C-alpha cells in the first residue's frame, strides 16, 4: 500500500482526499488473459495432434495457433503436477510430493502449499486480474475439505475469486460431488436431462468470464480449467463412444506401432526412436523377492480371447469418446473467446498432468475403486456391464495395455517418475498476440515447474518478493520464453529431479538415470537396494538401451546428483507404502479419534476426511425415526454409493441394510416384519469377527434392531 498523499485538516471541506492507497490493483493496459487447461491421465500418444488416434479438434486448434512441446514433463501424479504448475516450483518444495490422500506430515509431503510459494492466481489477483478455478482442484488436504474445517487451502483462499468444481482427485461425471465457491451444491441436472460434468465446467468457465466482462470489458482474467477427463470414471454419452466403434480393434500393441509412425512423421520424436517393451520389468523382483505387481502388467493382445478383445476395445472406445466429448466442450470456450474478441490476447497453456493411467489393471475395470482395494477385475464380471460401459452404472477404466499404448513409445505409466511413460506428457502453449510461432514444435526439455516462470516472462512480470505481505521463496522453474521464439535457443535448464511413490529419476544435460522400483501400492521399501539404470535420453527417448554397464561413472555421477537435488528440494523421505500402511498411518483429522457421531437431516454431505470411520471395525448406526404411515420409505444413513458403500433405509414399511462391496456384490439384511407406527430407534449393528483368509477384508455378524430388539 502506498502512503496517503492527501491533506487532512480539521474540516473535511478544507482537506484533500487521496484514493491511491485504497484502490484495488489495476492490471497494465492490454495485459493478456491467461487460460491454463489441465487434462487428467492423458498419455502423450492419445490426441491426434500428438500422433494418437483420438480426435481432438479443439486441441488441434490451439496447436495450430501455437507451439507443441515434445519433451514436456510432469511429476507422474496429479496433485504434485498441479501444485508445481501453479507455483513454478518443484512439487516437493511446496509440500506436495504425492496426492493429497497419501500425504504424510513431512516438509516434502504435507499437502499444504505454503504461503511463501504463492500460486499464479495469488500473484495475478494482486496485479488486478479476475481469477477463476473451474473443475478439479485436488490441492486441499482430506482433513480440510469439510464444512467445519479451515478453508485456508480452498481455491477461494489461494487467489481464486470464484470456484466451481470438485475438491478431490476424481468424481462421477454424471453425479459429481460439486462445490461452488466454499459450499457443496447439487449438479444442475441429471444424465437423463443431458447433464455431464464436462459441459457444466465449460458453461461455468464462460459464465465466470462473461459475468465480469459485461462490467469491466478491459479487465484481464486468469482461468484455471481442469476437466475430469481422462481420469476414471470414463463417463460419456453412448453416441460419443460409438463414434470410435471398431477403431481400436487392432489392439494396443498395433496402436503403438501406428502412433510411433505418426509421431515420427509429425516430427514429435527422432526418426530412430524405438518402441519400448510392453512389460519391461516382468522378471524384476523386489528386495525381498516380491514379484513385479500383477496390476502393473500388460496382457499381450494375441493372448486374449475374442470376448476379451471385444471388451478391451470397447473400453478404449469409451475413453476416446470421453476425451472427444470434453474436447468439444473446451471448443465452446474457445468459440466464446473468439466471438468476444479475446482469443488472440489470451495465453493458453494446455497440459496433461501425468502419463496415461494403469489403474485399470490387466483386465480393465467396471469400478476403478477395485484397484485401490487391491482387487483385479475379471472379464466375466465386466462383461455383465458391457452395454453400460461409460454410463452411470459403471465407474470404468480401460486395461493397462491401453495406458502403455497411449504413452507410446515410452515405458510404464502414471505413478512412475522413473520412466517417461509416467512423466512425458502433451503440452501446448499459444498466444497469437505474443508468440509468433504457429503450428510448430519445440524439442527443449521442459518441466511443469517451468510453465509459470515462462508465463511470467511472457507477461513481463517479475515474480514478486512478497505476496499478501509474505516474503516469497525463489521459483525453481526456468523460463523457456526464448525457445518459443527460436527453436535453437538455450533455455539454461540443465537438471531436473523426480520422485514419486518410491520411484526416482534425474535428468541432466541429455542423460537420465532412474531406479527400477515398483510404485505404491507395492510397498517394496529397501530403497538402498534399488537397481539403477542410465540412458542417454537425448538419443534414446524411450529408454530402450540401459548404459549402466557401459557408463558406470555416468551412473554414479547422476545418482549423486539425485541426492544433491533431493537435499535442495525436500526430496526425502521416500515413500512407497502399501494400502494397509497408508490406511493405518495417523492423519490430523479434525474429528479426532471419536467413537460417536450425530448427523442431522438436511445438512451438507460429509466427506471421507470428516465422516465416521467404519472400515475394518465393529460399528452401529442408530436412527431416531417417527413412522407415521404404513409403507413408509426413505434413506436413514448412507456412506458411498452405487460403486461401493453401505446404506440403512426403509422400504415398504420394513427396515433394510445393504452392504455394497465395490459395486460387485450386495449383501441385504431386512427386518422380519414392518416397522410399527410411531417413534422408534431403528438401527444396525456390525460385530467384526475376523478377516477373510489371506486378506485384510473383515468378516462379521450384522443385526437389525427396532428399539434395541433384534429383528433381522
What are these regions (language model features)?
Residues 1-528, 532, 541-560, 596-604, ...:
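Formylglycine-dependent sulfatase
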Residues 178, 506, 648, 704-705:
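Short aromatic-centered micro-motifs
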Residues 182, 510, 663, 704-708:
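Residue-level detection of beta-strand-connecting loop/turn positions
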Residues 226-231, 583-593:
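Core structural elements
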Residues 504, 512, 653-656, 702:
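Hydrophobic residues embedded in beta-strands of well-ordered beta-sheets
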Residues 589-656:
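Extracellular glycan-recognition modules
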Residues 661-681, 690-691:
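Short, aromatic/His-centered strand-loop micro-motif at the edge of beta-sheets
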Residues 677, 681-712:
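Carbohydrate-binding surfaces in secreted/extracellular proteins
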Amino acid at each position: 500500500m502506498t502512503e496517503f498523499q492527501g491533506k487532512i485538516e480539521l474540516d473535511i471541506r478544507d482537506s484533500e482526499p487521496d484514493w491511491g492507497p485504497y484502490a484495488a490493483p489495476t492490471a497494465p493496459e492490454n495485459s493478456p488473459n491467461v487460460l491454463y487447461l489441465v487434462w487428467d491421465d492423458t498419455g502423450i500418444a492419445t490426441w491426434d495432434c500428438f500422433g494418437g488416434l483420438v480426435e481432438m479438434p479443439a486441441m488441434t486448434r490451439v496447436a495450430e495457433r501455437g507451439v507443441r512441446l515434445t519433451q514436456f514433463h510432469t511429476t507422474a501424479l496429479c496433485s504434485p503436477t498441479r501444485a508445481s504448475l501453479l507455483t513454478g516450483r518443484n512439487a516437493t518444495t511446496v509440500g506436495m510430493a504425492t496426492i493429497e490422500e497419501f500425504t504424510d506430515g513431512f516438509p516434502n509431503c504435507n499437502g499444504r502449499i505454503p504461503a511463501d510459494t504463492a500460486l499464479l492466481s495469488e500473484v495475478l489477483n494482486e496485479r488486478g486480474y479476475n481469477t477463476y478455478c473451474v473443475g478439479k482442484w485436488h490441492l486441499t488436504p482430506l482433513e480440510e475439505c469439510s464444512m467445519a474445517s479451515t478453508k485456508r487451502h480452498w481455491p477461494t483462499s489461494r487467489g481464486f475469486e470464484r470456484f466451481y468444481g470438485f475438491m478431490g482427485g476424481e468424481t462421477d461425471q454424471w453425479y459429481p460431488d460439486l462445490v461452488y465457491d466454499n459450499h457443496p451444491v447439487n449438479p444442475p441436472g441429471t444424465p437423463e436431462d443431458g447433464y455431464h460434468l464436462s459441459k457444466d465446467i465449460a458453461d461455468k468457465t464462460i459464465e465466470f468470464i462473461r459475468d465480469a466482462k459485461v462490467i469491466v470489458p478491459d479487465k484481464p482474467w486468469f482461468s484455471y480449467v481442469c476437466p475430469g477427463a481422462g481420469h476414471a470414471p470414463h463417463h460419456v454419452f453412448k453416441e460419443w463412444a460409438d463414434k470410435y466403434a471398431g477403431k481400436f480393434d487392432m489392439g494396443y500393441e498395433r496402436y503403438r506401432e501406428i502412433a510411433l509412425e505418426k509421431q515420427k512423421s509429425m516430427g514429435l520424436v527422432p526418426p530412430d526412436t524405438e518402441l519400448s517393451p510392453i512389460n519391461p520389468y516382468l522378471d524384476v523382483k523386489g528386495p525381498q523377492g516380491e514379484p513385479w505387481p500383477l496390476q502393473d502388467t500388460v496382457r499381450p493382445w494375441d493372448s486374449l480371447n475374442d470376448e476379451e478383445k471385444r471388451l478391451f476395445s470397447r473400453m478404449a472406445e469409451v475413453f476416446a469418446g470421453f476425451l472427444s466429448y470434453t474436447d468439444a466442450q473446451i471448443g465452446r470456450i474457445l468459440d466464446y473467446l473468439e466471438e468476444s474478441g479475446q482469443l488472440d490476447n489470451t495465453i493458453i497453456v494446455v497440459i496433461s498432468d501425468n502419463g496415461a493411467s494403469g489403474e485399470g489393471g490387466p483386465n480393465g475395470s467396471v469400478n476403478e475403486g477395485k484397484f485401490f482395494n487391491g482387487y483385479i477385475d475379471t472379464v466375466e464380471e465386466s462383461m455383465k456391464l458391457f452395454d453400460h460401459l461409460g454410463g452411470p452404472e459403471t465407474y470404468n477404466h480401460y486395461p493397462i495395455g491401453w495406458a502403455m499404448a497411449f504413452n507410446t513409445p515410452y515405458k510404464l505409466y502414471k505413478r512412475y517418475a522413473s520412466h517417461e511413460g509416467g512423466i512425458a506428457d502433451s503440452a501446448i502453449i499459444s498466444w497469437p498476440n505474443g508468440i509468433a510461432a504457429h503450428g510448430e514444435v519445440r524439442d527443449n526439455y521442459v518441466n511443469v515447474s517451468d510453465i509459470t516462470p515462462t508465463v511470467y516472462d511472457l507477461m513481463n512480470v517479475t515474480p514478486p518478493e512478497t505476496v499478501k505481505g509474505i516474503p516469497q521463496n525463489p521459483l525453481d522453474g526456468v523460463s523457456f520464453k526464448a525457445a518459443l521464439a527460436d527453436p535453437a535457443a538455450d533455455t539454461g535448464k540443465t537438471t531436473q529431479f523426480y520422485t514419486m511413490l518410491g520411484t526416482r529419476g534425474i535428468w541432466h544435460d541429455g542423460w537420465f538415470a532412474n531406479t527400477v522400483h515398483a510404485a505404491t501400492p507395492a510397498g517394496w521399501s529397501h530403497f538402498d537396494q534399488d537397481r539403477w539404470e542410465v540412458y542417454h535420453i537425448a538419443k534414446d527417448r524411450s529408454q530402450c538401451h540401459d548404459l549402466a554397464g557401459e557408463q558406470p561413472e555416468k551412473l554414479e555421477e547422476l545418482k549423486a546428483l539425485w541426492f544433491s537435488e533431493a537435499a535442495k528440494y525436500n526430496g526425502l523421505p521416500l515413500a512407497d507404502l502399501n494400502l494397509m500402511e497408508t490406511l493405518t498411518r495417523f492423519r490430523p483429522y479434525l474429528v479426532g479419534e471419536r467413537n460417536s457421531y450425530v448427523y442431522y437431516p438436511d445438512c451438507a454431505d460429509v466427506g471421507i476426511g470428516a465422516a465416521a470411520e467404519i472400515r475394518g471395525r465393529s460399528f452401529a448406526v442408530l436412527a431416531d425415526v417417527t413412522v407415521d404411515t404404513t409403507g413408509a420409505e426413505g434413506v436413514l444413513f448412507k456412506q458411498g454409493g452405487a460403486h461401493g458403500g453401505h446404506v440403512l433405509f426403509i422400504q415398504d414399511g420394513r427396515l433394510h441394510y445393504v452392504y455394497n462391496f465395490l459395486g460387485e456384490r450386495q449383501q441385504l439384511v431386512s427386518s422380519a416384519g414392518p416397522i410399527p407406527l410411531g417413534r422408534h430407534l431403528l438401527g444396525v449393528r456390525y460385530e467384526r469377527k475376523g478377516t477373510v483368509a489371506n486378506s485384510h477384508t473383515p468378516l462379521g455378524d450384522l443385526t437389525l434392531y427396532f428399539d434395541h430388539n433384534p429383528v433381522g
